[in-house]
Amino acid sequence: MDTKLSVTGAKKSQGKASGLGNEGTPIGNEESTNKAKNGNKKRNKNRNRNKKTETKEQNEPKPVTGGEEVRVEKSQAKNRRRKNNNGANKKNTLHYSKEINVEERKQIAKRQEEIEQCIHTLSDFKLFKKGKHVTSYGYRISPMTDSGKISLKILFNIPLDYPKAPIKLTMKSNEEVSSYMDTVIANFNWKARQLVKEDWRILSQINYLVSELEILKMENYKQIDKLRNSFYKTI
């Protein structure tokens, strides 16, 4: 009997022990789970802390050494000079273009006004041809020759940039040109360069041609004109 009781008691004690072991297993799992969660939290905190540190380092300017500081200052100064030069050039270009436009308008107005004066005053002064760079007006003169007075149709070519460029005298293509008219044309065109610089109007230049025609026929006209100008300066 005693032997059976001891065996039975041993079995019961083993059953209790095994029961206690089974009851302790969930507690152990819960503790390990909590440890894992805490470990993850710590790792996440460390990651966030590292990210903040990296971001801060990126945002904060790096210390500049002496050589780098000089290079940065030179680059900034160069950029400022380039910006100032571009601004100044732009202003100068705009100012210059405005001046050109104003000067061109004055030039065109002066040219047109002088042409209209010739048309109004001279009945034979008529438009002959409009070109890309010059406008030609026909005019008839009556020079005296050895065989008497003749009528010739001449052309005054007025450039579009007159009075910057002088007018130019030519003969109409179907007109018979004598040698003395070649001399007249060459001498007048030489004189016209001087007259436009002295601000002679187109009408006054035409009057000069008509009134000085006999002198313009001379081969030594340039010498005569220079002597005449020297004489007038002494008066």
Curated annotation (Swiss-Prot):
Residues 38-50 have a biased composition (Basic residues). One of its GO terms (cellular component) is cytoplasm. One of its GO terms (biological process) is nonfunctional rRNA decay. It comes from the Eukaryota. There is a cross-link at K16, K35 (Glycyl lysine isopeptide (Lys-Gly) (interchain with G-Cter in ubiquitin)). Keywords: Isopeptide bond, Ubl conjugation. Residues 1-98 are annotated as: Disordered. Residues 51-60 have a biased composition (Basic and acidic residues). Present with 1230 molecules/cell in log phase SD medium. This is Uncharacterized protein YIL161W.
